[in-house]
Regions:
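N-terminal export signals
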Residues: 1-23
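Conserved flavin/dinucleotide-binding core of flavoenzymes
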Residues: 24-65, 119, 436, 442-614
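Glycine-rich active-site loop/strand segments that organize a redox cofactor
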Residues: 28-42, 112-144, 224, 231, ...
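N-terminal Rossmann-like FAD-binding beta1-loop-alpha1 element of flavoenzymes
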Residues: 75-103
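Glycine-rich FAD pyrophosphate-binding loop
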Residues: 93-119
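Dinucleotide-binding Rossmann-like beta1-alpha1 core, especially the glycine-rich loop
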Residues: 123-213
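Active-site/ligand-binding neighborhood in enzyme catalytic cores
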Residues: 219-357, 364-370
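Mid-domain catalytic core of redox enzymes
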Residues: 346, 350-485, 489
């Protein structure tokens, strides 16, 4: 439980596991009005946060944009308070000194970008969840820059095992939920793992052909491309989808392929959009007998905080605006620390201005002249479109740490080729719902810690990893409130991947919170109702984190033409423009926290070069 106190631990020092697990006895004493993580209902890119952004996209700010000058002049303005933007501000401050004046502007009511903190209250206690970015985890090692930043913030991923209490999940295993619309009956079947394939598929509501096909795929090592050399097999697998491989070469029935309908590969590639080669690298079934080699990823260390990577964002804000927490925080103490949002935009070296949508960034001088020292004008207004009042500040540098797609409409003077490149990616829509259950009895009765639901509204259910850190305890117990996470990545099967992202985004924006809540309650009732679950009594909190513009777009061998690295859209799009630089995950074509941090460091270096400092 979260007690909302700041523990007296020295900065930059992680406590021992024994210290981290020590209990506390007070409750979070904030309200949703003053503490955004407590706001429930529809969050993420919620109504009121994006209307002006859509107006900019639709050309409302195509001409000159008038605004009242606030008289403020900053060394740096950062557009976007996600991890990349916050990291850029800290890197810039280190380079220019503690007196550098920095303003961070964001259109949401909370900082962190996709790394949002969810806090749900029940009976005087508060329970944490993550609203987007889940963990420190990548299929490749963190760079020196990203690793050094984590260490400076007091985060040591190699210590995670000290806080992880896997014994609390003993007896719980993955399960699959089959829905009656697609499989004939609602049934939750545990035992979804390789040690149990025979009994698992025997207990599943599948016809004989589907069951036989899935058993063959999961248990037999068959070379489905016997007439090709290993190199030719690899080449072919790069050019076909996993669905095509299953249909054409593994001869799976339609029922067997339906089993994979909700399977999400990296960055939400689905069975019909994921290259078969990538599915093989992700250990999808069907490739054990193919004798095709592939690179083994050198994965980074893993660390999961109860609020996901919102902890990183909170530690960054604590460094930039020390009064936010009042005292220095460690990676452990910050888990329960209360931040004072009223202090974010007070006079000081760094200010964070939330609920403000930037609609224009423009040079007042000539961006093509290296020695032009005229400032950049930044205009912003309320993001919901209820007021036409706009304000302008001046900055010696600007870092665009928002989505690539919106930048051409905010910085219309960019070269046309660069604007086209920035418009190229189609961000992946995602929806993370944090659901607080009155207790964990239903999960224990069915013996599951995660559920795959191939054709349901939410395709994944996860019980959070059990950790003890900073006095906060995650324990999926039958006798205490339990946080679960539901994942949905809206898509439109049968279309190219980018089009699926666009159609999924439209669907998400069209749905209201009551509609999402009804689908959530219906699905959980159908999953757990036979185990005594009653959604009206047992669901005691719900926060839906809707991200129509979610994960950064990544290239694949089906939907993107090969081209030299220097010509790829994300590289062309991120080029500095006078005193303006770009830092975000989009600029790395990778949906990872560490690449967002790397982009921040690059953008700061480009800013310093633009001012003749390096």
């Amino acid at each position: 439980m979260i007690q909302g106190v700041i523990l007296p631990i020295m900065a930059n020092a992680m406590p021992s596991p024994a210290q981290a697990a020590s209990p506390a006895a007070v409750s979070l004493n904030e309200t949703a009005a003053s503490y955004p993580p407590l706001r429930t209902g529809l969050r993420g890119q919620y109504p009121g946060s994006f209307e002006v952004a859509h107006a900019a996209r639709d050309g409302l700010f195509a001409g000159p944009v008038t605004a009242t000058d606030t008289g403020e002049h900053y060394d740096l303005v950062v557009v976007g308070a996600g991890i990349s933007g916050l990291s850029a501000a800290l890197f810039y401050q280190r380079a220019m000194g503690p007196d550098a004046r920095i303003l961070i502007v964001d259109n949401h009511d909370d900082f962190g970008g996709h790394a949002k903190r969810n806090a749900l209250q029940y009976k005087g206690q508060t329970y944490l969840g993550y609203g987007g970015t889940m963990s420190i985890e990548t299929p490749f090692p963190y760079s020196f820059t990203a690793t050094a930043l984590l260490l400076d913030l007091g985060i040591r991923p190699d210590t995670y095992s000290s806080y992880l209490k896997t014994s609390r999940l003993k007896g719980l295993e993955p399960a699959v939920f089959y829905d009656r619309e697609n499989f004939g009956k609602d049934q939750l079947v545990p035992g979804y793992h390789e040690k149990n394939w025979d009994s698992f598929f025997r207990d599943s509501p599948l016809d004989d052909e589907t069951r036989t096909d899935l058993l063959r795929l999961h248990t037999q090592a068959i070379n489905y491309l016997p007439d090709l050399t290993p190199d030719a097999r690899q080449a072919l697998l790069r050019t076909i989808s996993y669905e095509t491989f299953l249909q054409r070469y593994a001869h799976m029935s339609d029922g067997a392929i339906r089993f994979f309908a909700g399977k999400a590969f990296r960055n939400n590639m689905r069975v019909d959009t994921c290259p078969a080669y990538d599915a093989m690298k992700a250990d999808a079934p069907g490739f054990n007998g193919m004798e095709v080699t592939h690179d083994t990823p050198h994965e980074s260390a893993v660390f999961h905080f109860p609020d996901g990577n919102a902890t990183i964002a909170r530690l960054l804000v604590g460094r930039l605006v020390p009064s936010f927490f009042g005292t220095p925080q460690t990676a452990a103490s910050v888990v329960m620390a209360q931040g004072n949002y009223s202090r974010l935009d007070q006079p000081g070296a760094v200010r964070i201005r939330l609920n403000s949508m930037v609609v224009r960034v423009e040079h007042t001088g000539d961006p093509t002249k290296p020695n032009d020292n005229k400032p950049v004008r930044v205009v912003y207004q309320k993001p919901d479109g209820t007021s036409d009042t706009r304000h302008a500040v001046m900055a010696d540098n600007v870092i665009m740490a928002c989505f690539n797609n919106i930048i051409p409409f905010i910085v219309p003077s960019l070269p046309e080729a660069q604007k086209d490149a920035l418009k190229y990616p189609s961000k992946v829509p995602m929806q993370y719902s944090s659901v607080l259950l009155r207790n964990g009895q239903a999960l224990r009765r069915c013996g599951t810690q995660s559920i795959y639901a191939p054709c349901s509204y939410h395709t994944r259910l996860l019980v959070d990893e059990p950790v003890d850190i900073g006095g906060y305890t995650t324990n999926p117990s039958p006798d205490r409130p339990t946080m679960i996470h539901l994942l949905r990545n809206a898509n439109a099967p049968g279309h190219p991947r980018k089009e699926q992202n666009r159609l999924g985004r439209q669907e998400m924006l069209a749905m209201t919170f009551p509609e999402i809540e009804a689908k959530t309650r219906d699905q959980l009732q159908r999953m757990f109702g036979p185990l005594g679950f009653n959604h009206e009594q047992d669901i005691v909190g719900l926060t839906v984190n809707r991200w129509p513009h979610g994960y950064a777009y990544t290239y694949d061998t089906l939907g993107d033409a090969y081209m030299p690295a220097a010509l790829r859209p994300h590289v062309v799009g991120r080029q500095p423009y006078g005193r303006i630089a770009i830092a975000n995950a989009d600029s790395t074509a990778a949906a990872f926290t560490n690449t967002a941090i790397d982009a921040a460091e690059r953008a700061v270096q480009e800013c310093l070069i633009s001012r003749g400092y390096t």
